[in-house]
Amino acid sequence: MKSTSDLFNEIIPLGRLIHMVNQKKDRLLNEYLSPLDITAAQFKVLCSIRCAACITPVELKKVLSVDLGALTRMLDRLVCKGWVERLPNPNDKRGVLVKLTTGGAAICEQCHQLVGQDLHQELTKNLTADEVATLEYLLKKVLP
């Protein structure tokens, strides 16, 4: 009897490949970022907050496609590290906004400098420039 994941991989092989590439990207990102004591998941949250400047946890959850409980725990860790702060939401007395601190903006910039083009080059090292362009074009075509 086949496992559920085997059946899923047979039905949606492209999904499995995309998932594997994403996992490889996250592993590489974790390796690159480890000297700064930040994980790929934390970096993604910081980048998303940076792009929005100030965002509600619910909006951030949608951007990242993660569980709100997991995001809340992640935000708690980022607050403890001094990279994120929670502020009262002037439009919702019960809600909060999350914003990067000066330290959060600095670590975000350090991460960008550390990773730079190296991650992209490592991920695409077995592809020609034309293949990279084609892959990018096709993946964008799959997205809405």
Swiss-Prot record:
Effect of residue 45 to E: Increased transcription of the region II transcript
GO biological processes: cellular response to antibiotic; negative regulation of DNA-templated transcription; regulation of DNA-templated transcription; response to heat; response to stress
Keyword set includes DNA repair: no
Pfam families cross-referenced by the UniProt entry: MarR
UniProt keyword terms in alphabetical order: Antibiotic resistance, DNA-binding, Repressor, Transcription, Transcription regulation
Xref: PROSITE patterns: HTH_MARR_1 (PS01117), HTH_MARR_2 (PS50995)
Entries under InterPro entries matching the protein: HTH_MarR-typ, MarR/SlyA-like, Tscrpt_reg_MarR-type_CS, WH-like_DNA-bd_sf, WH_DNA-bd_sf
Molecular function per GO: DNA binding; DNA-binding transcription factor activity
Protein's UniProt keywords contain Repressor: yes
Residues of the HTH marR-type domain: 11-144
Role noted for this protein: Repressor of the marRAB operon which is involved in the activation of both antibiotic resistance and oxidative stress genes. Binds to the marO operator/promoter site.
PANTHER family, alphabetized: MULTIPLE ANTIBIOTIC RESISTANCE PROTEIN MARR (PTHR33164:SF87), TRANSCRIPTIONAL REGULATOR, MARR FAMILY (PTHR33164)
Protein name: Multiple antibiotic resistance protein MarR
Gene that encodes the chain: marR
